[in-house]
Swiss-Prot record:
It comes from the Archaea. ATP binds at T11, F12, H16, P17, G18, H19, D94. Belongs to the archaeal FAD synthase family. Keywords: ATP-binding, FAD, Flavoprotein, FMN, Nucleotide-binding, Nucleotidyltransferase, Transferase. Gene3D superfamilies: HUPs. GO terms for molecular function: ATP binding; FMN adenylyltransferase activity. Pathway: Cofactor biosynthesis; FAD biosynthesis; FAD from FMN: step 1/1. Disulfide bonds: none annotated. It is an enzyme of class 2 (transferase). Its EC number is 2.7.7.2. Pfam families: CTP_transf_like. This is FAD synthase. The gene is ribL.
Amino acid sequence: MVTRDVVAQGTFDILHPGHVHYLREAKAMGDRLHVIVARSENVTHKAPPVVPDRQRVEMVEALDPVDYARLGHAEDIFVPIEQIEPDVIALGYDQHHEVEGIETALDERGLDCEVRRAGPRKASEDEILSTGSIIEKILDERS
């Protein structure tokens, strides 16, 4: 039997239902889910994580859909992908990565895998699906 490996990646700072939704959808794209947790110093597209790197890996690893979790490479985000050799890279519905850009980088490295984007989770009225929004709410309510 052929096993399909899927890679999901993200910051995963202050876990919320949107993260769980993304990881469940990613897991459904294959058999084994590998999650690459971004190093704090590599998060440049938004505010740096509040939660330390190792703690974020530990929290992600504890989630049911996740088979393996690891910290991303310090210098090259594609190193873990080369090591895992996934069949699918699952992007979150709102992640800043462009599918075409990832596909081009994979082609340049001789990596043959599909790039797919997970769908959004519909938030209920009282649900917060963003780490930034959670932090804002904490600051508002605790100030």
